[in-house]
């Protein structure tokens, strides 16, 4: 994406915690 590592961290966090 365009947001770089910051967005990736949020996406990874959501996947680990299975949140929407």
Swiss-Prot record:
Signal peptide: none
UniProt-annotated location(s): Secreted
GO cellular component labels: extracellular region
Biological processes, Gene Ontology terms: defense response to bacterium
Keyword Secreted: yes
Entry keywords, A to Z: Antibiotic, Antimicrobial, Secreted
Disulfide bonds: none
Function, as annotated: Bactericidal against several Gram-positive and Gram-negative bacteria.
Organism field: Styela clava
The protein's name: Styelin-B
Domain of life (superkingdom): Eukaryota
Tissue: Hemocytes and pharyngeal tissues.
Region (Disordered), start-end ranges: 1-20
């Amino acid at each position: 994406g365009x947001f770089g590592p910051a967005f990736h961290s949020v996406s990874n966090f959501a996947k680990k915690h299975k949140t929407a």
